[in-house]
């Protein structure tokens, strides 16, 4: 199994947030490219990376230490893809929010990562209506939130299951 090859401390700093355990969009895209290679699918090229500097981000590590000496900014790609999304079997129009930083939160350690990337759901389905393509099952966690919809672009329906939430929590999966 091929894994992401981080060649230097500078590359590591680019791939991962300073204040959070998650990867930045740069790390996520490196993982996305590796997954595309493994699955034999074409990656989406020329993705425009944006860093949302309208709100300081203090991730899980900063929150644990209650340390605000270092901050990050949420980073993402600026792309609009045409798909329908379902959360736990229901149309997600009211659940899945646009990828935007909430500016109405005053708590310094608010989890913008979860909010921005629509986390905390056990079953998300992306339907690209590519009926001539296969379906895909992703067993993922919070690291998949940044790229699952990009991977799903190469398939008809993609089911993203997070075993930590909802109906899968502490149960057998069959």
Model-derived regions, located:
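Extracellular glycan-modifying ectodomains
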Residues: 1-174
